[in-house]
């Protein structure tokens, strides 16, 4: 439990000259225990905790429940190989459902425990109205998001339980295969068209998410999976943390044709701060300037319209520009966007307005 002095300091309204930011993706629930950090204390490692969120105007976002493979089985560092033009990461093997369920419940419990111990400074939100209320009152709005659905069996029983616990967003896969779909492998340069699409169980999962009002996230799906989801849902298509393949030809980014489909559905792309998905050379270089983020925002705004662009930082899950640093550096990005000519109303849409619209249309209310 955080002390009284800590909570008093966190309750102060920050003098951030920009609208509060709702962010499409972070991995804080994974990194907090791995780095022995408290969400209530300003850390020297990682990107996101409550003090840094307040300082940077981070008003909330999708908090990923992600289960990594055991390191003895697979690690990204060991799986990566470099080519003359870029890199390729050997796909992670499938994850055992029993392990995934235990780890998923642990991470979901961690988020609910943070909510309880925050004494009203963070809320696990279940409706768009709750998100909007939190942003207006300065309460951090946390959406429980499942990144890879290995914890859910093909009968989908676990989905109902997780929904009751607060789950409102789900990516059928991370970048590995499971019973529902095939994740896009990490490769540069490369096409996201890397294999088959949704399985029959995956199609059932998407339909059930539609019935419940759970947002389906497309960011780690391969291209055929993307189009399968597009053909199954009337909801806005959302890629919570992806960029433009035309600017950075990594497999994790979206082609122009995919971007057009997101636009036509009324959906949204959350611009990812991961430098390897920003740079035209795909290098994982923390010295990458913040202007690489604005470059993708500019391209997406021109291609799909500003109403379909948001932010999807990947805080605590990727190398981001050193100039940005962590969540406390978000005003530097907003200032860079203002210098690019974005108006106050456009900055509000980028910061949270577009996300709010999509959440209303997907969840109702």
Regions found by a protein language model. Give the residues of each.
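N-terminal hydrophobic targeting/anchoring segments and the immediately downstream early-domain regions
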Residues: 2-192, 249-311, 315-365
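Divalent metal-binding pocket/active-site signature
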Residues: 151-153, 162-252
């Amino acid at each position: 439990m955080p002390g009284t002095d800590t909570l008093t300091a966190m309750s102060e309204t920050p003098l951030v000259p920009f609208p509060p930011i709702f962010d499409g993706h972070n991995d804080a629930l994974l990194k907090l225990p791995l780095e022995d950090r408290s969400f209530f204390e300003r850390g020297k490692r990682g990107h996101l905790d409550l003090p840094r969120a307040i300082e940077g105007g981070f008003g909330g976002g999708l908090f990923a429940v992600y289960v990594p493979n055991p390191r003895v089985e697979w690690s990204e560092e060991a799986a990566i190989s470099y080519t003359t033009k870029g890199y390729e990461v050997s796909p992670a093997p499938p994850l055992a459902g029993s392990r995934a369920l235990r780890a998923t419940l642990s991470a979901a419990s961690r988020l609910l425990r943070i909510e309880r111990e925050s004494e009203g400074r963070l809320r696990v939100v279940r409706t768009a109205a709750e998100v909007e209320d939190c942003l207006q009152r300065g309460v951090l709005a946390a959406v429980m998001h499942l990144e890879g659905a290995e914890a859910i069996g093909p009968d989908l029983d676990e989905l109902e339980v997780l929904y009751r616990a607060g789950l409102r967003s789900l990516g059928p896969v991370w970048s590995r295969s499971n019973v529902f779909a095939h994740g896009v492998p990490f490769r540069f340069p490369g096409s996201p068209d890397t294999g088959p699409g949704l399985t029959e169980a995956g199609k059932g999962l998407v339909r059930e998410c539609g019935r419940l009002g759970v947002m389906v996230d497309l960011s780690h799906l391969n291209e055929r999976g993307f189009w399968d989801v597009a053909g199954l849902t009337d909801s806005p298509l959302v890629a919570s943390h992806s960029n433009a393949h035309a600017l950075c030809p990594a497999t994790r980014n979206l082609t122009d044709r995919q971007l057009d489909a997101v636009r036509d559905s009324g959906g949204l792309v959350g611009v990812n701060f991961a430098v390897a998905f920003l740079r035209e050379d795909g290098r994982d270089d923390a010295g990458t300037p913040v202007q690489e983020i604005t470059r993708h925002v500019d391209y997406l705004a021109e291609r799909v319209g500003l109403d379909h662009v948001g932010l999807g930082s990947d805080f605590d899950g990727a190398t981001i520009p050193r100039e940005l640093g962590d969540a406390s550096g978000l005003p530097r990005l907003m200032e860079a966007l203002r210098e690019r000519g974005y108006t106050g109303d456009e900055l509000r849409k980028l910061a949270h307005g577009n996300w709010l619209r999509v959440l209303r249309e997907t969840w109702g209310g």
